Amino acid sequence: IKKQVIVTDEPELIHAEEGIAPDVEIHHRNELDAIQRQLRDISGVTALIYVQTCASEKRRRRKRNAYPDPAERLFINTDICEGCGDCSKQSNCLSVEPVETELGTKRQINQSTCNKDFTCVEGFCPSFVTVHTRDMKRPEKFVGFPTGWPEKPIIPSLENTPSRIMVGGVGGTGVVTLGALLGMAAHLEGKATRVMDMAGLAQKGGTVYSYVQLASDDEQISATKIPAGQCDILIGADAIVAGSKAALSRLRDEAVVIVNEDASPTLSFIESRDWYAPITDLITRLKGRVHHGKLVTLPAARIATQVLGDSIYTNQILLGMA
């Protein structure tokens, strides 16, 4: 091998490792593009190793206090932000989200999903504000809850036919967790259940489905995946996923659909500064597929953040509505 290079976000840790050959170069990830251009001009075999812990894995370890958690957070001052999108281009991060203001579409950082990589601040922008704190302040109170208890819902019987539920959303938001929660709850009640998760190659932000079937006994469930036209309830954690052809094709004519109006940005938002989620078109598409009164939409992410301080509880809000 003519040349070996390690690129990492923590070069000091690689330097401290024993067993690294003396001819192996170690560089910060900021030099990745220059290193790639350098290696392509070398005749022969070269090796480029990129060392960085997955963002989702960092979040898991931080929850278990097994990975350093920087005591700082980044915010974007929307009064200064001009919506140029350079922060998105620098970071390729979907936690940099659009926010509508009186002066047009600006940028904001979703504090519930931010992995504290901080590459967004490398953009040429004075609107970033660094706050040195470990935890966000939780809401002290929430005014607006209705008084009294709602009417007790009528729970359909599972004696003659199973209940088929599809949860659709994006990776990293708890779609699989919600499917597992429903399956375990049914199991604890002594009911038969089948749960199948469809994540495919989805990473954080990719499309994810969880198919949940509940029945009084196992013989009522003939297939693990919900067949086309057989879904009774669709919990749409993301409106873009819920309004897709793949989701709509599973619905029964009498299906009930609960959809979160707060859509997550897609890859197109990074590439196009003027991208916006076509929520109105998606809701119209759902209305055309679902009978009147069977579609419920709500800003679940905003409710979860305002009431509980974190949008990670969005799916539980939708489950409660269902």
Question: What spans do the regions from the language model cover?
Answer:
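Active-site cofactor/cluster-binding pocket
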Residues: K3, R40, A55, T130-V167, ...
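Glycine-rich ThDP/TPP pyrophosphate-binding loop and its adjacent helix/strand module
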Residues: K2-A66
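Active-site lining segments that contact anionic ligands and/or coordinate catalytic metals
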Residues: S43-V45, A71, S88-Q90, G104-K106, ...
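Generic, well-ordered alpha-helical scaffold segments in large soluble proteins
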Residues: I35-Q38, I42, C87-V96, F128, ...
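Beta-strand segments within the central parallel beta-sheet cores of soluble alpha/beta enzyme folds
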Residues: V7, T105-Q108, R194-A199
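Gly-rich Lys/Arg/Thr-decorated short loops/hinges at beta-loop-alpha junctions or inter-strand turns
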Residues: E12-I20, A66-E72, T101, T161-S163, ...
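Short, flexible loop segments at boundaries between secondary-structure elements
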Residues: P70-D86
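Iron-sulfur cluster-binding cysteine motifs and their immediate structural context
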Residues: Q52-T53, K58-R64, E82-P139
